[in-house]
Amino acid sequence: MMVRIKVSHLIFLIASIIFIFISPYIFGDYGLNIVNQIAIFIILAVSYNLINGVTGQFSLEPNGFVAIGAYAATLVLLSADAKNDQFFLDGPSSFILAIHSNSFILALIVAGICSSLLALILAFAVFRVRGDYLAIVTLGFGIIIKIAAINFPSITNGSRGLVDIPQFSTIYWTGGIAIVAVILILNIVYSKYGRAMKAIRDDEDAASAMGINTFWIKTLAFSTSAFLEGAGGGLLACLLTTVSPTQFDFLLTFQLLIIIVLGGLGSTTGAIIGVILVIGGSEWLRFLDELNIKIDSLNLDIQSTPGLRMVVFSIVLILVMLFARKGIMGYYELSDVIRGIKKRFKRSKK
């Protein structure tokens, strides 16, 4: 597949590289941590958008693949001594004990491959169904992965999780990999495979009648999405330096769903905008979780309500679905917006 660089893509690339290199100088530790989270969620969102938005398959599996990637990368990076120290109740299996590498890139590749291989196997089951049934099957997959993480302590250390993971996820790694992920997804979207994915989204039966191998194309989108979600999970583990089953519940999938719907299903640019609004906004609205309101004259006493900010985002999602059903960008990309501005500018000059 030939790499295509449009003017808008070049602008995005240059602006992103500049932002990555100046971030350590303009943000404190807390701000830099949020920027790292945004970069990782961009990877997760654009990859999830490939299967859900571009290909039109209503899948609810991201938390499962992110969990697999996080655990796979962690088990590669932890030394044998660190594993023995942490698996103090149920010793690690001999295979888990033997796995070790200090290579961060290798750990991310292993994380991506593990998720992608499982996606290939899962595709034979999930793509026998469509629509709501597909959503239910993939939702079940995420739940199974979380339960497996709890009930296989010799592999995952169970509910105790794993800690002291090397913190490799600096802004240079997370930002750089996010750029690579975005460029990869954009090149897929604008390739013949991307056109086939869009045809399946618009009308799968018609796409099949035109000679498109719908199962193969959906599997390609699913496995590519899973690879990036797995790598993103590895990055997340190395940012937080800890993994546990509770980190990978359905809330993660729901958050990604809000992001791509808000930005516009099928738009990579929209997914990026959605990440900035949701992740950045959720940090800005963190005060809502700790909000205490007491007005004696009204006999009103509201104590802190954990999760209130997610209620706010749920309301935002409902409003978007009601008044802007295609999201902020719809199906459009940054290049389409620039093209539209150029056309209007030319018309105004005539």
Go through each PLM region and give its residues.
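Transmembrane alpha-helices and adjacent helix-loop boundaries
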Residues: 1-350
